[in-house]
Amino acid sequence: MSEAANNLAVSLFSEILAVDQLARANVARVLPKGMELSHFSVLNHLAHAGVERSPAQLAKTFHLTRGAMTNTLHKLEWAGWVHIRPDWDDARRKMVAISPSGQSARDAALAAIAPVIADVVSKVGEDKAKAVLPVLREMRLKLNQVD
């Protein structure tokens, strides 16, 4: 790879990492009291999936260790936002589903997050946001293939 290509790659990933850090901070600031960004991410995933997931499946989805996911799931269960039950086919496994209060908490978080995100998109411009989305999606897919 040429020096110019290396410089482009470093600049691009530096911007992506900076945007990620700032986006997380701004989103975390408006989440409902007691909800962390990791909690919202899991609740949002379960709400979209519409089916139960095992802790191992969730850990893989979020590129976390099983221990880290178990910790997050215990916090979500304690808050009443997920139901964790034994897997009827394999007693060694558990299955996780979003609870009605978890769905409500996720909806409240989404309602708080949406204006923050929409404001940034508005300031950048919808056309620019639409133009960069396919590139970011392709980069995500390429990076996911590395795993």
Predicted regions and their residues:
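N-terminal leader segment of winged-helix/HTH proteins
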Residues: 1-33
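Alpha-helical linker/hinge and terminal dimerization helices associated
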Residues: 16-19, 23-27, 62, 105-124, ...
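Hydrophobic structural patches
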Residues: 16, 43-46, 136
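Charged, amphipathic alpha-helical coiled-coil/dimerization segments
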Residues: 74-134
